[in-house]
Regions:
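Metal-dependent phosphoester-hydrolase catalytic domains
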Residues: 19-23, 121-122, 137, 156, ...
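Structured beta-strand-rich core segments of catalytic domains in phosphoester-bond hydrolases
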Residues: 27, 47, 70-144, 232-235
């Protein structure tokens, strides 16, 4: 009888452990995150009026898990924007300067509520102003998720080469999930079939993201194992671009 009770107790413990592992895995598979991508134009609007504090307020109110910013200027002249945003948002961050001058560093920054476990900055082939991608790996409840913050050039030939380099970089990630967000400076961007265009998938690709144009030039792409839930373009005239926001299921 004692052996039978002991056997039953062992079965209960094993069942409990298995159930716990299943629930943990389900939690990892069903984590919803909010991401914002925004070219902040060095903290000025299209008329060059300073808007950095309004941008900070907007981003704080978004309550996003991940924020990818382009055209961020870390200099005494316009304010140390990377540092100011980090302090106000209270998030982990990684900055990559595409352009380094004597008095300023200008480029990409990614903020994350999740722990950053790896990061690197890659220069893209550029014939005019230097462009690049900022790669950050975050830990989302035990799962590595690659965040790729992008700013491409404005010249068509330059863009084609930069897209090839971006594609090669993505292929190097293997099977890890990824999110690509940023300013591509071109309409009708298509990556390979493994990349999901979030706006197009949710039938919202006709919304412009650039206040001086009539087309969508800012994008969020995800790998096949990430599910787009919703997508919005926010008409905020704090930059020459509009911010884009997506909810994704990891």
């Amino acid at each position: 009888m004692k052996l039978k009770k002991l056997f039953l107790l062992i079965l209960i413990v094993i069942s409990s452990v298995i159930s716990s592992n299943v629930n943990t895995n389900e939690g990892r598979l069903n984590t919803d995150i909010k991401i914002v991508s925004y070219n902040i134009h060095s903290g000025v609007d299209k008329d060059m009026f300073p808007t950095l504090f309004d941008i900070i307020d907007f981003l704080k109110n978004c309550d996003a898990d991940i924020i990818c910013l382009q055209e961020v200027n870390e200099s005494a002249k316009v304010g140390f924007q990377v540092s100011s945003l980090k302090e106000e948002l209270g998030m982990n961050s990684h900055f990559g300067a595409n352009v380094v001058n004597l008095n300023s560093n200008y480029g990409l920054v990614t903020y994350s509520k999740y722990r950053i476990i790896r990061q690197n900055h890659v220069y893209l082939s550029s014939s005019k102003e230097q462009r690049g991608i900022l790669h950050t790996v975050i830990d989302v409840k035990g799962k590595n998720v690659n965040i790729i913050n992008v700013h491409l050039g404005t010249n068509k030939e330059e863009q084609e080469e930069q897209l090839k380099e971006l594609q090669t970089f993505i292929e190097g990630l293997g099977n890890e999930p990824y999110i690509i967000a940023g300013d591509f400076n071109a309409a009708d961007i298509n990556l390979d079939d493994n990349c999901i265009d979030v706006a197009k998938t949710l039938d919202k690709s006709n919304t412009l993201t650039f206040s001086l144009g009539i087309e969508r030039i800012d994008y969020i792409f995800v790998s096949q194992d990430i599910v787009p839930i919703n997508y919005r373009v926010i008409i905020k005239k704090l930059s020459d671009h509009y911010p884009i926001i997506a909810k994704l299921r990891i």
